[in-house]
Amino acid sequence: MNTNTPAHPPEGAPLSEATQAALASAEHAPDSPGATHIRSFVHRRGHITQRQRDALEQLMGKWSVPYAPRPLDMAAAFGRQAPTILEIGFGMGETTEKIALARPGDNFLGVEVFNAGVGSLLHRIEESAISNLRIVQHDAVEVVRDMIAPDSLAGVHVYFPDPWPKKRHHKRRLLQPPFVALLASRLAPGGYLHCATDWEDYAVQMLEVLGGEPLLRNTADGYAPRPDFRPQTKFETRGLRLGHGVWDLMFKRA
């Protein structure tokens, strides 16, 4: 489950200066003038494995796209024209890898701030020879606002975002009305927004916020069944076995 908390390498053999510079935008890039938002992640030190460190060092240039405050040329980034799916907060990338492999006709752009998660997915991409997946390591709000052209996405996945369970922290939840409106504007007509959470009160908020966006319509009467393309994670399977709930929401651009 993604916590949207960027990890920092522990003390030891440092990443190269070039790699550090490539990673820095995920933590230090300023907002565009006059455009500010409450970030849905916090800066804390975290563990990163040697394999993840090696992937960051060796594979960022091959499979990642640097943040830039201008629309991304998807055809150039992927080397082909294909429907593009944006995934926000892919955690360690297990689900992202499986979906990209199962849907070779689509392009997938994953956005994450964790060094450990980015390193993990880079390794998965290389190991599984996934050609239809790219990564942007940067704040998701800025990526959507600055790099995604209006009416351009075939779909958006937001799976298990940080629930920020304390009431005073709910303002940090990713899926707030302004961001949902921004996501909806980036979807092509007929494009979908698929969210999943295992926190019931966040599911209630998601349903309210998505249902209040004029550009979106619910494809179900309330919550949706888990679509076949979203694999059930080990964490999710264990939670369901213990009686915990998982709520999927599927909305489409009108």
Curated annotation (Swiss-Prot):
Annotated region (Disordered), positions in chain: 1-34
Keyword Transmembrane belongs to the record: no
Xref: Pfam families: Methyltransf_4
Active site positions: 162
Binding site for substrate: 166, 198, 233-236
Residues engaged in binding S-adenosyl-L-methionine: 87, 112, 139, 162
Keywords attached to this entry: Methyltransferase, S-adenosyl-L-methionine, Transferase, tRNA processing
Role, per record: Catalyzes the formation of N(7)-methylguanine at position 46 (m7G46) in tRNA.
Protein name per Swiss-Prot or TrEMBL: tRNA (guanine-N(7)-)-methyltransferase
